[in-house]
UniProtKB/Swiss-Prot annotation:
InterPro entries registered for this protein in UniProt: YaaA
Protein's name according to its UniProt entry: UPF0246 protein Rsph17029_0026
Pfam families from the UniProt entry: H2O2_YaaD
GO biological process entries: response to hydroperoxide
GO cellular component, one term: cytosol
Residue ranges the record marks as coiled coil: none
Length: 257
């Protein structure tokens, strides 16, 4: 079983992660593609970044500086799970994983990225902001989806072949999972859905759902899951499996609001 997560917009101010002696930070397997994208992004102005990603002027200026230094500042790279600091990563809590779970996560948890394509948790990355939905024109097309094409799906296929995984658990957002070309992907996909019930209404509450996606990835890693039916035992954040709302491809987890 593989699990995929979205990255985080918010980055840790002081990234830190204690690793066991036999587990070292790794290098992104699609680093050459990231370098190519960074060269394109390096030519963008702060106004360009504001327009493309709807971000503030200070954040746009910060990322202009980051892309300008991207190829010279490789020594500033840190493991992805240490750098990402959003709600999903609060649910994952990689800093508190034991050594065995972290080793398993390194092999079976994948992080989708607009800049790096596909990451392992311990892949060393540099601070950046480049969302997958960005309409950044490259020689491959008008968007990052065009740039990545089937490369992310093929990278997932390769990870599955290496690990023996037979199913992909999609804990990513629609924006990011769209980058995994389903026609090229050789794995069946299971997409857990996290709903909150309040006043008789059931709906996705973004904050809790993002945390639950990270917690689901942690649950998979800690228990080294391979059988999709074992996902039903997930209980973090007050969520519980709801069989009446679920299908095999879309298990639903419900919490009281």
């Amino acid at each position: 079983m593989l699990a995929v997560l979205s990255p985080a917009k918010r980055l840790a101010a002081r990234p830190a992660l204690d690793l066991p002696a036999d587990l070292a930070p790794s290098e992104p397997r699609l680093q050459d593609q990231a370098d190519a994208l960074a060269r394109v992004a390096r030519d963008l102005t702060a106004a360009d970044l504001r327009r493309l990603m709807h971000i503030s002027e200070p954040l746009a200026r910060l990322n202009v500086a980051r892309f300008a230094e991207f190829h010279e500042a490789r020594n500033a790279a840190v493991p992805a799970v240490a750098l990402f600091d959003g709600d999903t990563y609060a649910g994952l809590e990689a800093r508190t994983m034991d050594a065995d779970a972290l080793r398993w996560a390194q092999e079976r948890i994948c992080i989708l990225s607009g800049l790096y394509g596909l990451l392992r948790p311990l892949d060393r990355i540099q601070p950046h902001r480049l969302e997958m939905g960005t309409r950044l024109a490259t020689e491959r097309g008008a968007t990052l989806y065009d740039f990545w094409g089937d490369r992310i799906a093929e990278a997932l296929n390769a990870r599955a072949a290496e690990t023996g995984a037979r199913v992909l658990v999609n804990c990513a957002s629609v924006e990011y999972f769209t980058a995994a070309d389903r026609a090229a992907l050789k794995l069946p996909v299971i997409t857990p859905t996290f709903l909150e019930e309040r006043n008789g209404e059931r709906k996705v509450v973004s904050f809790w759902a993002k945390r639950a996606r990270g917690a689901m990835a942690r649950f998979i890693a800690e228990n080294r899951l391979d059988d999709p039916e074992d996902l039903r035992a997930f209980r973090a954040g007050g969520y519980a499996y709801e069989p009446d709302l679920s299908t095999d491809e879309r298990p639903v987890f419900l919490r009281a609001g």
